[in-house]
Regions:
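Extended, subdomain-level signal for the structured scaffold at the beginning of enzyme domains
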Residues: 1-111, 120-123, 140-145, 151-154, ...
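Residues that mark the start of a beta-strand
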Residues: 5-7, 131, 162
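A short beta-strand/loop micro-motif in the catalytic core of glycosyltransferases
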Residues: 111-112, 132
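Active-site-proximal catalytic alpha-helix in oxidoreductases
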Residues: 118, 164-177
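Short, glycine-/small-residue-rich phosphate/pyrophosphate-handling segment
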Residues: 126-144
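Amphipathic alpha-helical segments enriched in hydrophobic/aromatic residues interleaved with Lys/Arg
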Residues: 154-165
Length: 210
């Protein structure tokens, strides 16, 4: 039968951290359910980039990225990924961003963040009572500003029900591999990591000391 792709939306914005969104984009777009048929098959994930407007965004480091959709034209999503970066400092307080995230949170099977993207989710009150994490430099801020969030400091990514938050920047790769595992099992996730020549994380613990 035809492969029913999961529709993944990655929120992109000015001053986004490049690897925050490119890491998960890479993982989910190179996934194959059957590694031996890689050349002849597509990913089970259809990854789309969503921004506030249809204008190109400029990342940290000045890469220009063209979104597939704006908030208004965004289709129904199965998975939402909210990355981080300097841009979140402003965006986490913007009503249209919070409204979009709240709306999508109701329809998705899986709500996820990378790095400081979790601060947007936290300010939308989506992480109240939820075990969550963020970039190591923002853990203290998360604790101080969002008293209802159960801040986790020792895991590389944290899964609580249908919400997954990850640590900083490169952690989005491991978090995305975990999404693959969650949907298609460990063997598919390992094969995806191997294809990327990326070490598959066996134990979910923070990779750096801070």
């Amino acid at each position: 039968g035809k492969l029913m792709q999961k529709i993944v939306g990655i929120f992109i914005f000015n001053d986004i951290e490049v690897l925050d969104f490119c890491g998960p984009f890479e993982v989910l777009s190179v996934t194959r359910v059957d590694e031996s048929k890689r050349a002849d098959t597509i990913s089970p994930f259809d990854v789309k980039l969503i921004a506030q407007t249809k204008e190109p965004i400029t990342t940290t480091g000045k890469m220009k990225v063209i979104p597939d959709y704006d908030f208004e034209s965004c289709p129904k999503l199965d998975i939402l990924i909210v990355p981080g970066g300097m841009g979140t400092r402003k965006l986490m307080y913007e009503k249209d961003v919070l409204d979009f995230v709240l709306k999508k949170a109701k329809e998705v099977e899986l709500l996820t963040s990378v790095c400081t993207g979790s601060l947007i989710l936290a300010n939308a009150k989506l992480l109240d009572g939820i075990e969550s994490t963020t970039h190591w430099k923002s853990l203290e801020r998360m604790e101080n500003e969002f008293k209802n969030v159960k801040v986790c400091k020792d895991k590389h990514f944290v899964e609580d029900g249908n919400i997954i938050t990850s640590a900083g920047i490169s952690a989005g790769i491991d978090m995305a591999l975990h999404i693959v595992k969650r949907y298609f099992g460990g063997e598919v996730a390992k094969a995806t990591a191997k294809h990327m020549e990326y070490p598959y994380m066996i134990e979910n613990k923070r990779k750096i000391v801070f």
